[in-house]
Amino acid sequence: MPIVIRNGRVIDPASNTDRVADVFIVDGRIAGVAPNLSSPKAEVFDATGMIVAPGFIDMHVHLREPGFEHAETIESGSRAAAAGGFTSICCMPNTKPVNDSAMVTSYIVEQARSKAAVNVFPIGAITKGSAGEELAAIGAMKAAGAVAISDDGLPVMNARVMRRAMEFARSYDLPIIQHCEDLNLSAGGDMHEGANSVRWGLRGIPAASEDVMVARDLVLAQLTGARYHVAHISTRNAVAMVEYGRSHGLPVTCETTPHHFGLADADMAPYDSNYKMKPPLRSCGHRDAIIEGLIAGTISAIATDHAPHPGSEKMQEFERCPFGIIGLETALALALEELVAPGKITLARLIELFTTGPESVMRLGRGTLTPGAPGDVTVFSPTVEWTYDVNQSASRSRNSPFHARTFHGGPMATIVNGGLKWSRQSSHIT
């Protein structure tokens, strides 16, 4: 059925649109953006007082399927995405088996086609088993549907292997995404190395562990010409190096997470495992540098790094529990509160970070409301008041530091390929 999204403020950075208008979707695609559109057979969504944007893209999500379905599935993770205003998500390869072959990539594509509430795009591994030694079947994975390659939380430590991976990535025109961490510097660490790690008696992860890897990889990106992307950037020096590379013509991009611009290590509740993630929450100075990078345009995208873990694993001693938090349902609200409400960035810039920014890296053919584009739309309110109850999350996991937080601003409706998948009014996910 056609759908008309009526009377919202339409902001589409891809087409430089910012005006009150209607959005008309027919047969799963954008048919028009203009005032006073109507169709007697169309479903109507009243967006008066709301922002209507291209469907948001999260380029860094862990769906855990296959292999870890007790933590998340493609179905449950995609439902959490819909409830967070995301219409497209890219899933990392740290599954069991690792997504290092066309067989696993095809499995994810087929499961997503039949069960996902939103568009799901798989990311293939750089190396077999993400072991950092032998390159995975990159060409075969791309043919099966992979949109990028990454070993995710297992950085490619061997520079020779990384060089070869970049050469292959360039030949297949795929971005290569690196979790930047020198494991020799960070080994055994549980939180940011600084005054708080000393105070709490926890081993630290120095900012230098990220900086060293970014520096090495920028040299390799210059050597190979690969499209290189830094995942969840978290340090001042790393942001500066990415800016240096971009200013010298390197095809380098980076993303950051809502928790890295919304929290610092000073905000951590001592020994609360819901504040344990990697990269860790850094000092206030590093957090401020991340915000500066978002303002300046050095950072291309906001990505959640949604990393579900069941309570049986996460609620252990801080030193023993796994890294990571869920984030799909709180990302937009955090960005509105921490970035837009204080006047640090505009609504248009926020939407760029969730649409044209990740689209420029992943090249999914999404992230715009121009006629003919897929009918993916995110409707949100900058002011709606709501309280996040992690126990009501669509995710299978509950590991969030934002439980019981009252937000001002958040998603109102998620439309995927012309179908209403979630709305705040009904809270029903289809």
Curated annotation (Swiss-Prot):
Its cofactor is Zn(2+). One of its GO terms (molecular function) is dihydroorotase activity. Pathway: Pyrimidine metabolism; UMP biosynthesis via de novo pathway; (S)-dihydroorotate from bicarbonate: step 3/3. Binds 2 Zn(2+) ions per subunit. Pfam families: Amidohydro_1. InterPro entries: Amidohydro-rel (IPR006680), DHOase (IPR004722), DHOase/Allantoinase_Hydrolase (IPR050138), Dihydroorotase_CS (IPR002195), Metal-dep_hydrolase_composite (IPR011059), Metal_Hydrolase (IPR032466). Zn(2+) 2 binds at residues 152, 179, 232. Substrate binds at residues 62-64, 94, 309, 323-324. One of its GO terms (biological process) is 'de novo' UMP biosynthetic process. Zn(2+) 1 binds at residues 60, 62, 152, 305. One of its GO terms (cellular component) is cytoplasm. It catalyses: (S)-dihydroorotate + H2O = N-carbamoyl-L-aspartate + H(+). Gene3D superfamilies: Metal-dependent hydrolases (3.20.20.140), Urease, subunit C, domain 1 (2.30.40.10). Catalyzes the reversible cyclization of carbamoyl aspartate to dihydroorotate. This is Dihydroorotase.
